[in-house]
């Protein structure tokens, strides 16, 4: 029996395994402007936009100091952040460019 998820379904949050928590926070909070909501010891942080409990969880539980995953391995490939206006998107892009962050 097949089932199709309703079109109104939304993803509430995602958790990302990171090698360096501070580096991830520098990117998501420092460059993109997400808010740090809380931390869980030295191994996890929860960030959001607009005061939500967390849109993104960042953790090093099984990935601390790990090398980047090989290009041809399974895993998350792309994430899109929908800014409310083109101006907000332009601000984020300028911050990335000004920080010499690689954009592909």
Label each residue range with its predicted role.
Residues 1-6:
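A detector for short, charged/polar N-terminal pre-domain segments
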Residues 8, 18-22, 80-104:
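Vicinal oxygen chelate
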Residues 10-14, 75-79:
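Short amphipathic alpha-helical segments
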Residues 16-62:
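Core segments of cupin and vicinal oxygen chelate
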Residues 26, 57, 68, 89-91:
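Short acidic, gly/pro-rich beta-turn/loop elements at beta-sheet edges
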Residues 40, 51, 72-74, 89:
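Generic structural signal for well-ordered secondary structure
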Residues 59-74, 80:
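Conserved donor-binding loop and adjoining core beta-sheet/short helix segment
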